[in-house]
Amino acid sequence: DGTLIGDSNGIYRTDENGEILISGLQPGKSVVVTETQAPPGYLIDTQAQTVQIKEGRTVSLNFKNQPKGELIIQKRDSATGQPLAGAQFRVTTAAGCEVGLDGVIGDSTLTQNGIFTTDSSGEIRITNLAPGAYVLTEIKAPHGYVMDAPSTNVVIGEGGDTQTVVITNTPKGGLVINKLDSVTHEPLEGVEFTITEAD
């Protein structure tokens, strides 16, 4: 009949063994059990279970929670493989919803401006991710580097899947012009050049 059983909200909480024992239920009634909150780091079991209470019997129900996944972004120099700090990324679901530092999707848990920055070891770690497709968009390369690919797709699988994505940046190039005396090979000061991009 929809009447709540338990505390004033009809809520029971598991003990240290992950169990709840409910006694004194009236035989012949059907009870619907719905998980309303998963433990930290786990996905909620959305499947409600209905059970018929029988006189003198204790019925067991099992709910299973899958661990959430983790994403590790590693930023590296494309030539040397050295880690790069200071790269900035925006992480979204395939549907375009922004992901926060703790993996929760929505406005309340976003990092500052929704941007993740690689640390001194060139990494970003995001935990508590639900299985699904994500898009990593590099919005700023580290100083002295150019972006090789602005977006990378990654899929977090079920069962606590951890995905490590290595994204590289190419160091910016340089140009050295030497102006020398053709006879003495001494450097010549004050010479002007015009530099343009080739077609």
Locate predicted features.
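Solvent-exposed loop/turn and edge beta-strand elements of beta-rich ligand-binding domains
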Residues: 1-199
